[in-house]
């Protein structure tokens, strides 16, 4: 099968959607299929370590839902997408975030292949979906199949564009995150390491973790907070750091992908206090795959991944007192940390990329058979 995978996002900046696409592509190729990834990029192809990548357009940073999306807005690139689709004649065109400009919408408009769209985002209010509904409702009919990575993600888009959405979650590279790698020796000094991984964006809730940390640091001086992720601190987090003179807080910035498993293994507790805007909890699964117990906000996207008390601990969002209490309970009870880590690691096995990719491929086959009854007869 010949498959085109369309991303709206800058391929030079790793993120959840691009990682999803790369892993799907790798799995499909291991099954014997041919894949082509189409995305904008801010770097030359030769620097991007993706041998099946076609770059269309230069991305620019666009504020979006409390984050920054690096997408191309040049409508002239639509003609290049049209030409590529005509030349390649894909069996399947899989469009990620199919209602975003410019590449996904161009693929949605011009593709004559079987078109599948995956909706990744969770936004409580999507002004773009609402404002452009009179136009997009006609284009979305060009999708023969729709996937959402979680029920919350499906619920948001279905509010504006009703229909069936096949729930197929994000996957995780278990071989990478479950690897038996050593923790970082410099942090193996008897302190309790609390880890945060995420962009320095307000919606990631770091300010609430810093506030919770300030509540427990004086009772438990042996705790340390490790913060991994790119970006600049928001004003609220800066204020907490300045006013409370917090000790043993290390900002590590963006770290190499290959080092992430070691940070998870170094951590005694992983904490993700996001306030919303999460359709799924990839970082939660990464931590669980590494055997690290998780404390996270009880928001829709995270609650689809964690059952409170079974695979981790959920606390009310934006509640630093509740977060501090959960941290204290875990700090005091090493047996709870161990048990949650073991259960989380076992649970994460269900999200392996080979299983997720197989589900996506089965969906392709189902849609192809519905579109072409002769294909069903040929398979039987």
Go through each PLM region and give its residues.
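Conserved donor-binding/catalytic core segment of Leloir-type glycosyltransferases
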Residues: 186-214, 226
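Nucleotide-activated donor-binding/catalytic signature segment of Leloir-type glycosyltransferases, i.e.
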Residues: 237-255
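Short hydrophobic beta-strand element within catalytic cores of glycosyltransferases
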Residues: 293-296, 306
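N-terminal strand-loop element at the rim of the active site
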Residues: 7-12, 26-75
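Conserved acidic donor-binding segment of nucleotide-sugar-dependent glycosyltransferases
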Residues: 308-309, 313-320, 329-334
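Carbohydrate-associated surface elements
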Residues: 41, 152, 171
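Short alpha-helical donor nucleotide-sugar binding micro-motif in glycosyltransferases
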Residues: 254-255, 262-267
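Acidic donor-binding loop of glycosyltransferase active sites
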Residues: 265-279, 292
């Amino acid at each position: 099968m010949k498959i085109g995978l369309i991303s709206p996002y800058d391929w030079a900046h790793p993120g959840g959607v691009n990682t999803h696409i790369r892993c799907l592509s790798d799995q499909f190729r291991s099954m014997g299929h041919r894949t082509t990834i189409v995305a904008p990029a801010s770097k030359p192809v030769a620097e991007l370590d993706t041998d099946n990548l076609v770059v269309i357009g230069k991305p620019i940073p666009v504020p979006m839902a409390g984050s920054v999306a690096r997408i191309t807005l040049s409508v002239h690139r639509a003609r290049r997408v049209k030409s590529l689709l005509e030349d390649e004649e894909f069996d399947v065109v899989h469009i990620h975030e199919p209602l975003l400009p410019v590449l996904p919408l161009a693929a949605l408009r011009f593709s004559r292949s079987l078109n599948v769209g995956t909706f990744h985002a969770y936004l409580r209010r999507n002004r773009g979906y609402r404002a452009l509904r009179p136009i997009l409702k006609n284009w979305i009919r060009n999708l023969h199949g729709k996937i959402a990575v979680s029920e919350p993600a499906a619920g948001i888009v279905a509010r504006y564009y009703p229909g069936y959405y096949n729930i197929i979650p994000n996957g995780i590279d278990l071989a990478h995150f479950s690897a038996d790698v050593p923790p970082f020796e410099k942090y193996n000094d008897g302190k309790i390491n609390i880890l945060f991984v995420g962009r320095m964006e307000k919606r990631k809730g770091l300010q609430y973790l810093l506030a919770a940390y300030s509540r427990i640091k004086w009772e438990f001086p042996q705790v340390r907070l490790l913060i991994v992720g790119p970006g600049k601190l928001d004003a609220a987090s800066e204020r907490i750091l300045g006013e409370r003179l917090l000790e043993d807080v290390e900002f590590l910035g963006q770290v190499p992908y290959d080092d992430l498993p070691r940070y998870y293994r170094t951590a005694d507790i992983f904490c993700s206090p996001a306030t919303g805007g999460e359709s799924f909890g990839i970082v939660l699964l990464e931590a669980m795959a590494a055997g690290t117990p998780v404390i996270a906000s009880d928001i829709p996207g995270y609650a689809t991944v964690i059952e409170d008390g079974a695979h981790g601990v959920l606390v009310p969002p934006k509640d630093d007192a509740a977060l501090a209490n959960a941290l204290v309970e875990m700090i005091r009870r090493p047996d709870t940390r161990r048990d949650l880590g073991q259960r989380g690691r076992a649970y994460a096995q269900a999200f392996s990329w080979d299983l997720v990719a197989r589900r996506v491929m089965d969906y392709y086959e189902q849609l192809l058979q519905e579109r072409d009854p002769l294909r069903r007869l040929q398979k039987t």
